[in-house]
From Swiss-Prot:
Keywords: Aminoacyl-tRNA synthetase, ATP-binding, Cytoplasm, Ligase, Nucleotide-binding, Protein biosynthesis. L-aspartate binds at E176, R222, H452, R497. GO terms for molecular function: aspartate-tRNA ligase activity; aspartate-tRNA(Asn) ligase activity; ATP binding; nucleic acid binding. The keyword DNA-binding does not apply. The lineage of its organism: Bacteria, Pseudomonadati, Pseudomonadota, Alphaproteobacteria, Rickettsiales. It catalyses: tRNA(Asx) + L-aspartate + ATP = L-aspartyl-tRNA(Asx) + AMP + diphosphate. One of its GO terms (cellular component) is cytoplasm. This is Aspartate--tRNA(Asp/Asn) ligase. One of its GO terms (biological process) is aspartyl-tRNA aminoacylation. Belongs to the class-II aminoacyl-tRNA synthetase family. Type 1 subfamily.
Length: 605
C-alpha cells in the first residue's frame, strides 16, 4: 500500500465498500459525539468523512485532539453510511472510512482565521497568510478555474493556427500609457531595463519576421494604482497578433474564442457572435462611457436643440457658451418619492456636477418636476420622443461641456440602473467599441498627444494626417483601434497597426516627437518597417478580468494566487523590501538623502 494514499478525498464510492484504503489531507472539521469522533478530511480534490469509534478508545482520543488544518494520514475500511446520514452535497457522501490508524504528518499552529467556511476575514491577514487563504474552497476553486481557463485558451488558439511564443521580460522603456518598472543594469552602470507593459513591439516584430499568427499568455507590468478590476504591478493577457488582416478579421477570430470560453465555464446567457459594434462617439453619447454595460437598458439622449430656445435660462445660456444638454431616461420612476430624486441630485453633486434636474411624466400624462414649467407642450412631446420616454417614466438632465456632460451622465446612468434594479440578470453582454480618436488634447501640456496606442493605423492613412491642419481637425481623426467590453468591464484593447515608416514619423511628429526621437525610442521597429512589413493587427484580452467575470468575483485579488495589496505590497513575501548597501553599489545606485535616512533606519546599515 502507498505510504500516503491509495485514493484522493473525492474518489471513494459505494463500489469501494469493504476495501482497505489510505487517505491523506487536512483536518477540515471535527465533531465529537462522545462514543464517536468524525473528521472531515480534505485534500485538493474534495472531502471524505473519517470515523473514529470507542472500539479503539486510544485512537478516538487521539483524533479528538487533532488541530484543524493539521495534515494527517488515515488508514481504514470503507463502509456505507446509514440511510439517515447520507450527505448528497459530497461526492463521497454515501460512504465513510472507519479508521484503524492515524498519523500526524504535520501539526498546525493556531489559525489566524477560519478555513472551513467563507466567513469574512481581514484582508491584511488573508494576504499575509495567503497559503492558508488558498485552502478555502471558494478561492481554491477560483485558482483552479484560472488554470482551466488558460488551458482552454491555449487549445482554442492552437486549433485556430496560432503559434505560441515567449517574448523578453527585460526590455526597453516605451510609452504605453503607464509608468514602467525599471531594472538597473549591473553591467551597464546608469542604464536600466524596463519590464514590458505589453509585448507590443516584439509581437509586431514577429509579424515582420514572417510568422503569421502569434499568441502568448503574456505577463505585463505597469506601475499603476490598484482598482477592483486592476491589480497593481502585474497582470496577464491573451496577447495575439495576425498578419494580412483587417479589423473585421480580428473580430471574427476573437469573438468565437470568447463565446466558447464563456459558454464552457458558465451557465449564463452569453452574447453570440457577431458582437454589437458601437463607434466611440456614439458610445460616449448613448452610454456616457467607452465601456458601456449593455445589461443596463438606459440610453442617454442629446436634447440640446430642445433647450436652445426654451425658457430655462441656465441651460439656454450654457448652450450659448458651447455646452450641451443631455437627458437620462429613468423608466417607471415618475411615481417614486421626492427622496429618490433628491438622492440622485446628491449623487450627481458628489461626482462634481453643479446639480441635476428632472421631469416626471405620470401614468395619467401629468407633467411635474423642476423643469416642466420651462418647456412648451410641443417641446415636451419632442423630449419624450427623443429620450424614448413614456408616461410613468422620469427624465434627468445635465448640462456641461460635451466631455464632462458625457462622463457625468454615464455615472448617473449606472446609478439609475442600480437604484431602479434594471440590470439584466445572469448574462454576459459583449460589445465592441470602435473608431477611437487617434489624438487627444493634453490639458497639462497644452499639446496634442496620442489618445491610446501610438502604434495604431490612423483611418485614412497618411492623407488624413496631412490634410488635418487645425487642432479640431486633428482631434477628429480616428484610429483603427477597438476595445472589447463585457458587462461594463473593458476586457481588451486592440488595433490594426501602423506598418509604414512614413505614416509613423508623421503621426509622431504631430504629437511632438522628432524623427530622431522616434528612431531612438523605437529604433528596432522603424528599422524593421523599412525591410517589408506586412499589414497586421491584434488584440489582447485580459486573463485576470475574464476569470474575474467567470468566477463572479468582486475583486481581482480573488482570482490571483499571490496578489499584491492596494498599496502594491506583497505581505506574504514582504515585498518590496530594502536591500543592503553592497547590492546598491553593485548597481551604481545612490539613494537621495531622505531615502538614505529611511533605508538606514529600516536596515541598520
Amino acid at each position: 500500500m502507498h505510504k500516503y494514499r491509495t485514493h484522493n478525498c473525492n474518489e471513494l464510492q459505494l463500489s469501494n465498500v469493504g476495501q482497505e484504503v489510505k487517505l491523506s489531507g487536512w483536518v477540515h472539521r471535527r465533531r465529537d459525539h462522545g462514543n464517536l469522533v468524525f473528521i472531515d478530511l480534505r485534500d485538493h480534490y474534495g472531502i471524505t468523512q473519517i470515523v473514529f469509534t470507542d472500539q479503539n478508545q486510544h485512537l478516538m482520543d487521539y483524533a479528538s485532539n487533532l488541530c484543524y488544518e493539521s495534515v494527517i494520514t488515515v488508514s481504514g475500511t470503507v463502509v456505507a453510511r446509514s440511510e439517515g446520514t447520507i450527505n448528497n452535497k459530497l461526492l463521497t457522501g454515501h460512504i465513510e472510512v472507519l479508521a484503524v490508524e492515524c498519523i500526524v504528518e504535520s501539526a498546525s499552529s493556531p489559525l489566524p482565521f477560519v478555513i472551513n467556511n467563507e466567513k469574512e476575514a481581514p484582508e491584511e491577514s488573508r494576504l499575509k497568510h495567503r497559503f492558508l487563504d488558498l485552502r478555502r474552497e471558494k478561492l481554491h476553486n477560483n485558482i483552479i478555474l484560472r488554470s482551466q481557463v488558460i488551458s482552454h485558451i491555449r487549445h482554442l488558439m492552437i486549433v485556430r493556427g496560432f503559434t505560441e511564443f515567449q517574448t523578453p521580460i527585460l526590455t526597453s522603456s516605451s510609452p504605453e500609457g503607464a509608468r514602467d518598472f525599471l531594472v538597473p543594469s549591473r553591467i551597464h552602470p546608469g542604464k536600466f531595463y524596463a519590464l514590458p507593459q505589453a509585448p507590443q513591439q516584439f509581437k509586431q516584430l514577429l509579424m515582420i519576421a514572417g510568422f503569421d499568427r502569434y499568441f502568448q499568455i503574456a505577463p505585463c507590468f505597469r506601475d499603476e494604482d490598484a482598482r477592483a478590476d486592476r491589480s497593481p504591478g502585474e497582470f496577464y493577457q491573451l496577447d495575439l497578433e495576425m498578419s494580412f488582416v483587417t479589423q473585421e478579421d480580428i473580430f471574427n477570430t476573437i469573438e468565437p474564442v470568447l463565446y466558447d470560453l464563456f459558454t464552457k465555464f458558465t451557465d449564463k446567457i452569453v452574447s453570440k457572435p457577431p458582437f454589437v459594434r458601437i463607434p466611440y462617439n456614439e458610445s460616449m453619447l448613448k452610454y456616457g462611457s467607452d465601456k458601456p454595460d449593455l445589461r443596463n437598458p438606459i440610453i442617454i439622449s442629446d436634447v440640446t436643440e430642445i433647450f436652445r430656445d426654451s425658457n430655462f435660462t441656465i441651460f439656454r445660456e450654457n448652450i450659448k457658451k458651447g455646452s450641451v444638454v443631455r437627458a437620462i431616461h429613468a423608466p417607471k420612476a415618475a411615481s417614486l418619492p421626492r427622496s429618490f430624486f433628491d438622492k440622485m441630485i446628491e449623487f450627481a453633486i458628489s461626482e462634481g456636477a453643479i446639480g441635476l434636474s428632472y421631469i416626471q411624466f405620470s401614468e395619467t400624462g401629468e407633467v411635474k418636476g423642476p423643469l416642466s414649467k420651462f418647456l412648451t407642450k410641443q417641446q415636451l412631446e419632442i423630449l419624450k420622443a427623443t429620450s424614448n420616454t413614456s408616461n410613468g417614466d422620469a427624465v434627468f438632465f445635465a448640462s456641461d461641456q460635451k466631455d464632462k456632460a458625457a462622463k457625468l451622465c454615464g455615472k448617473v446612468r449606472i446609478k439609475l440602473g442600480e437604484e431602479l434594479n434594471l440590470l439584466e440578470k445572469d448574462c454576459f453582454k459583449f460589445c465592441w467599441i470602435t473608431d477611437f480618436p487617434f489624438y487627444e488634447f493634453n490639458e497639462e501640456t497644452g499639446k496634442i498627444d496620442f489618445s491610446h496606442n501610438p502604434f495604431s493605423m490612423p483611418q485614412g492613412g497618411i492623407d488624413a494626417l496631412e490634410q488635418a491642419k487645425t487642432t479640431e481637425e486633428l482631434l477628429a481623426l480616428t484610429a483603427y483601434q477597438y476595445d472589447i467590453v463585457c458587462n461594463g468591464i473593458e476586457l481588451s484593447s486592440g488595433a490594426i497597426r501602423n506598418h509604414k515608416p512614413e505614416i509613423m514619423y508623421k503621426a509622431f511628429s504631430i504629437a511632438g516627437y522628432s524623427a530622431e526621437e522616434v528612431d531612438k525610442r523605437f529604433g528596432a521597429m522603424i528599422r524593421a518597417f523599412k525591410f517589408g512589413a506586412p499589414p497586421h493587427g491584434g488584440i489582447a484580452p485580459g486573463i485576470d478580468r475574464i476569470v474575474m467575470l467567470l468566477a463572479e468575483a468582486t475583486n481581482i485579488r480573488e482570482i490571483i494566487a499571490f496578489p499584491l495589496n492596494q498599496q502594491a505590497e506583497d505581505l506574504l513575501m514582504n515585498s518590496p523590501s530594502y536591500v543592503d548597501e553592497k547590492a546598491l553599489k553593485e548597481l551604481s545606485i545612490m539613494l537621495s538623502p531622505t531615502s538614505r535616512k529611511i533605508h538606514k533606519k529600516n536596515t541598520g546599515l
